[in-house]
Amino acid sequence: MVIILLLVFFVGSSVSQPCHPNDLSALRELAGALKNKSVTESWLNGSRCCEWDGVFCEGSDVSGRVTKLVLPEKGLEGVISKSLGELTELRVLDLSRNQLKGEVPAEISKLEQLQVLDLSHNLLSGSVLGVVSGLKLIQSLNISSNSLSGKLSDVGVFPGLVMLNVSNNLFEGEIHPELCSSSGGIQVLDLSMNRLVGNLDGLYNCSKSIQQLHIDSNRLTGQLPDYLYSIRELEQLSLSGNYLSGELSKNLSNLSGLKSLLISENRFSDVIPDVFGNLTQLEHLDVSSNKFSGRFPPSLSQCSKLRVLDLRNNSLSGSINLNFTGFTDLCVLDLASNHFSGPLPDSLGHCPKMKILSLAKNEFRGKIPDTFKNLQSLLFLSLSNNSFVDFSETMNVLQHCRNLSTLILSKNFIGEEIPNNVTGFDNLAILALGNCGLRGQIPSWLLNCKKLEVLDLSWNHFYGTIPHWIGKMESLFYIDFSNNTLTGAIPVAITELKNLIRLNGTASQMTDSSGIPLYVKRNKSSNGLPYNQVSRFPPSIYLNNNRLNGTILPEIGRLKELHMLDLSRNNFTGTIPDSISGLDNLEVLDLSYNHLYGSIPLSFQSLTFLSRFSVAYNRLTGAIPSGGQFYSFPHSSFEGNLGLCRAIDSPCDVLMSNMLNPKGSSRRNNNGGKFGRSSIVVLTISLAIGITLLLSVILLRISRKDVDDRINDVDEETISGVSKALGPSKIVLFHSCGCKDLSVEELLKSTNNFSQANIIGCGGFGLVYKANFPDGSKAAVKRLSGDCGQMEREFQAEVEALSRAEHKNLVSLQGYCKHGNDRLLIYSFMENGSLDYWLHERVDGNMTLIWDVRLKIAQGAARGLAYLHKVCEPNVIHRDVKSSNILLDEKFEAHLADFGLARLLRPYDTHVTTDLVGTLGYIPPEYSQSLIATCRGDVYSFGVVLLELVTGRRPVEVCKGKSCRDLVSRVFQMKAEKREAELIDTTIRENVNERTVLEMLEIACKCIDHEPRRRPLIEEVVTWLEDLPMESVQQQ
């Protein structure tokens, strides 16, 4: 009702009359500051402004005054002009849902007649202190969904205020009592999605009039105050996403007008009071993700107007003794992740509007009620992780739910036979039958599910071959047949799946507004990765842990959309098809534990998004590819292949050195290499041959030593000859370089002519070599791997611009070198390598990375990034913030590396691809929709680094046993379950104040917000990190 009353101000039409000269001038100045000419072009011609789009006037026929300016959703860009303050008769100002930026001009406070102000959903920033304080007649103030900051008290107090919405901003501080005491009639108050702290006591004066109270997604603590239960006019109460605790009082029954109660994601405990008999107007109840226990409140049956009932993720137990027949409007019922038991009530099938029903992870048993046939509106059904029986009858019942698009039945019907006579399911997009132990062959009735996109049959006892008709399932793009007993070859038809060749982008009808995640599990014990809609599933084929044989089809290269391919633990033979290198989106490739032979295609170096790769335990030979991501894969990815050699180890470097030293005993070296690869067969050979092999080993070692000596003896004359052959060379040293007279030949010699032994790092832009100069100083030389794509003058200008970025927390660029076709960048040397090395590779790293050191690293890296974003001229977006680009000096001070390199290289030659910028695990979600890197994207990536410091985990873990998932998803799930403390790295947990670490975790979560506009600026992150205490708790 209050919203309707306020909208009365907007009713009216433009008056055909000239407007006041002051108003005309102010509007023209406003138009000059805006960029959407389609709206403001007409404003610049003529003087009859009362006829202009969005302008409303009142007054005399001679000169009307502008009283309403209404321009919502007009695509306006630019800033709000100070001239608005000259429209002194303005009563309504609505510029909402545009793209206005900058600060709100203080001149708005001159609009003493203003009653409605709506600047919501823009890009406004800065403080509002003193900006709107002069609006004495204001009744409706909406500045939500911007980036406004400061204390909540900065907004001011207004005696006639009816509605105040400051949600989705950056306001801080406590809720001050004056907010309501100055206005006795405030009815709508929305403070949600800010950074407010303290308790709810400051709202005591609102209790007389408030109808809608929203304070969700802040940092509030304490219990619900008693006055809250006495607001009899209250219709909507939303407190979700805070740290509120205690129990709900039985006085909740006093709120008889309540329509919506949302208190999810807090720390409430004890039982849910059974007082709903007096809350008959209730339409939406969400108490999910708390610590409630006890029984299902029976009095809920009297809330006949309920549309949404969400009790998930608590510790509720017992059977559901509730008659659902009266819930004629119930659309969403979520009881997942509790301890409910017993059979499902038949009455549950008498909810005609039910669209979403989630009963997963409980202890329900028995059969699915036959009444479920009546759920004709049902879209989403999850019954996983229970003890339901009679799969055949279940499908017979559910086939009548003709709108069903998502069906998750995992971990039920243990050991039953798969039926062959199923019909219906015409709209099914997701079918999950994993971990059921079902027996039989893959049923042909699946072909009737024309819209099926995701099919999970993993961890069952399916046998026989993969059917050829699977290629006819045009919508299918996610297949998991892993952990069965399937046999035969992979059918060519699987490479004809249209949605894996080219994703059509038509996601199913699955509702993502419910907030109910689907969890994709890759093994029996993992919690899985959440995907809230079908389009978020990664296109995948999992056929691992079966008995499949034959060769890997070269036609698999057709599946350009494929992200995950796991064929491990089968009986495949033959070679690895080179066509796989054409799968540009591939993130996971696992071919381990098969019988493959031949070599790893060198073209695999082009798979720049590959984060997990394994060919372990096959019969492969030859060199392991040495470019791209391959330096980052662990030894375990290649073990069990005695014929493989790695380019940075022997014998591959020996083969290379023989090319440089043709006079060396290459024949002995090659023979030795063959011996090393075939030595396993000596187990049954005679003693005489064994002695011969032993002598060969001795010769091999002598040969390798001889070659190594030759490499170390490469002289200046040889390097000079190579330089001349490559063409003209040039070296430019900046003032920061300590070696002023360095020549190109000396630079090459300092790296042993880019010897493998001098490699100290590998990134998306190329290898990094350690340079040892004659005077004892060191440098890091980056050999850019991409085509620079620029004229020499442009390249030099870009590099010199980067050299001017000088800050103590940046790796300083000391010079560059052009040598033939190579571009070399000379950086200061960091003694302690990268943060990634200390966190994830060095065995004793955690002994050094105590909490104080981690915090110092986070602070330093944040300061370096803030310099790039705000101080450096021109401003620099890093595009690839990650732990391996944070280098550490001898004092473990952080230095940000690789900034600005994306501008030096052609995008198709580096990690900065035409599809995404950055490195897997650090890439912001919005980059999948846009090719434009932003400062907010850098903040997301930095937030992932903070998660690494808190948890000690990689952003995308190499699978270990049965726990494989990405870090961001894990953090959000643990946070939702209020288990944040379990995320803290166990190596620091005992020696640090837990609250301090959790504060850093909270900062990280702000940085990785899915919505870019809600992420903080990096300078805000710097401030928050510097406020964290350094002292670690000493061990007792």
Curated annotation (Swiss-Prot):
GO MF annotation, one: peptide receptor activity
Protein's name in the database: Phytosulfokine receptor 2
InterPro entries: Kinase-like_dom_sf, Leu-rich_rpt, Leu-rich_rpt_typical-subtyp, LRR_dom_sf, LRR_N_plant-typ, Plant_LRR-RLKs, Prot_kinase_dom, Protein_kinase_ATP_BS
Species in which this protein is naturally found: Arabidopsis thaliana (Mouse-ear cress)
Limits of the Protein kinase domain: 754-1025
Record keywords: ATP-binding, Cell membrane, Glycoprotein, Kinase, Leucine-rich repeat, Membrane, Nucleotide-binding, Phosphoprotein, Receptor, Repeat, Serine/threonine-protein kinase, Signal, Transferase, Transmembrane, Transmembrane helix
UniProt-annotated location(s): Cell membrane
GO cellular component, as recorded: chloroplast; plasma membrane
Family label: Belongs to the protein kinase superfamily. Ser/Thr protein kinase family.
Signal sequence range: 1-16
Catalytic activity: L-seryl-[protein] + ATP = O-phospho-L-seryl-[protein] + ADP + H(+); L-threonyl-[protein] + ATP = O-phospho-L-threonyl-[protein] + ADP + H(+)
